[in-house]
Every structure is written in C-alpha cells, then in structure tokens.
Amino acid sequence: MAYDFKPLPAPGDILWCKFPHDEDLGNPGPYPRPGLVLNVFRDIHAVLMTYGTSQVGNVYDGEFVIDDQLDTAGLAAPTKFDLNRLQKLPFNDIWFGASPGVTITVPLPKMGVIPPIFMAPMRAAWAIRKK
C-alpha cells in the first residue's frame, strides 16, 4: 500500500523522483533523480513532473539547465530539465523519496526550489518544446 506524502508540493519545487522510462510508462524508474513540479492536482493527490538529468552537455529545444544557485535548488550538480518529458505521478512513496543529504522535510521528498533567475530560461524552453 502506498503512503501519500502530505502536504502536496508547490509548482517550482524540486523533488527526488523515480521518473518512469519512456518504454515503461506507468511504472517507477529504477532509480530516483531530480524532477521539477510544474503543476499540482489536489483532487487526485498527484503532481505534473518534468525529467531531470545531470547530462547537461547538449541542451535541445524544450530543455534548460540549472547551473547556479545549486543550494537553493537542492542539487549536487548542474541539472538539465526536459520539458518535453512530462508525467503526472501520484505523490506517494512509490514514486518519490528523500534525497540523500537533503534536510528540507516539508514536503518530505523536497530537495529545493527552482531559483528565480531560472524562471525566464524555463519559460523560454517551454515556449519551444515539442508539442
């Protein structure tokens, strides 16, 4: 039985998430990674997440990198977020967990928040993402 984390996070929060692989949607990914909350669905206790990766070498349309203010974001290294890869996921312990070394506890799997200076790059990436 899944345990729901409460309270729900807010858009802009960065969470430790088992984002699913494209080939296995509906099942948690094999290991957790950072994910960015884009929307919250209170009626179904779920969040809309975007995929995060430390592979920041190439940045394509619909992607942006947080490479500064890592402490605010709760990230250990620069991280690319892919706004082309979105998933609505239940906010529970099957899909989310506490990140190693992170001390923010509300809501539990929260790592940090998107630093305000990255809102403009995120909006620009959203505007040119694949539809």
Q: Which residues make up each language-model segment?
A:
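Compact nucleic-acid interaction/catalytic patches
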Residues: G26-P32, V37-A73
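C-terminal terminal-subdomain/extension
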Residues: Q69-K131
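Short alpha-helix capping/helix-loop boundary micro-motifs
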Residues: M1-F5
